Amino acid sequence: MGLKCLLAAPTGRAAKRLTEVTGHDASTIHRLLEAGIDPNTGMMVFTKDESNPLKADAFIIDEMSMVDIQLLHCLLRAIPGNKRLILVGDPDQLPPVGPGFPFGDMLRSNTLPVVRLTEIFRQAQESLIVMNAHRVNRGEAPDLRSRKSDFFFLPARSEQEVAQTIVDLCARRLPTNMGIPPEQIQVLTPTRKGGVGTWNLNRVLQASLNPPAPTKKERSFGDFSFREGDRVMQIRNNYDILWKKLDGSAVGSGIFNGDIGTVRAISMEQETVTVVFDDREADYDFTMLGELEPAYAMTVHKSQGSEYRAVILSAWNGSPYLLSRSVLYTAITRARELLIIVGREECVAAMTQNAKVGRRYSGLKLRLQGKTE
């Protein structure tokens, strides 16, 4: 048809995945809209809007469940009214961190053309990952008894046992018995705090997978000591940080929220930490280390838009807001080949039954239906 099409997603990780599966360049929505900082207010602003619209015939936005009402508003302002906009996403995943849930509102309004995709290509149809994802989505308990599939449940009697089991899976059992190296395993947890939160799990996983050694330099920042060899994640979009290809073939700028890399070197003389992201590397001044977090374990929220060869999920007592069906469903659907849940079966059952999501009032559904609140 000869149409010019632009692809985008809410996070850098999701945009990268979109590029990989389509073979076409994709960017973050922020980069598409040319985000910048207003020097007078210090607030983020977008160059693209009604007066300076995006130039394309069609726009495809992936992972729409992560897009809040404010970002969608800015996106729509920048797209001329006579163009095509295709929004792709899974409304059963976690809602955005920011205000509203516009993707869900649009679907529930029954005013827009919708195509529901039902065929799964990531796993075989008989995959227990797929079947349990469907079961959880319907509010049915997942099958936790199977021992001959891609989905396993390992019971634990305490938070300490959960953490110890996860460390053993990452450091010994999966690499030895299934040939899955630690760097292809992602530990997910609903919470940041507590014995099975990201802070403690990253601490014990670092101690096991990347212990201190005389040959490894370290740099402390906050409550964590970054060490050469550590797995880390960028936690906010940085459009200005410079990177270079490992083969020296190109240079550029921009490391994005959700990008995962490995600490290659720490220079005390230059006060920098060098992180390798796939085929690129970037230098972080010590003052910039607040943009990085350890990534041996991450929250389920942070995993949205990504997929991993193997996922280990902790399931333990916590806030009903965090232990919800959407959290469990999102975690299960991050796994490509293997999913292991470690914890309490009662917790998994409670998550399956907890379909409550904090109510979000944006008025979008009613506006689309031509009604007033």
Placement of each model-derived feature along the sequence:
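Conserved helicase motor core of SF1/SF2 NTP-dependent helicases
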Residues: G2-L3, A9-K16, V21, I29-I37, ...
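Conserved two-lobed SF2 helicase motor
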Residues: A26-I29, Y296
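Short gly/ser/thr-rich secondary-structure transition/capping motifs
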Residues: D38-T47, I69, P214-K216, L322
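Acidic, low-complexity intrinsically disordered tails
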Residues: P39-G42, K48-N52, S362-E373
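Structural motif
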Residues: A58-D62, I86, L188, M233, ...
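Residue-level recognition of short, solvent-exposed, well-ordered loop/turn junctions
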Residues: P80, S225-E228, F256, S303
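Conserved helicase motor core of P-loop NTPases
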Residues: V88-S253, R264
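C-terminal accessory regions
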Residues: R138, L246-D247, N257-E373
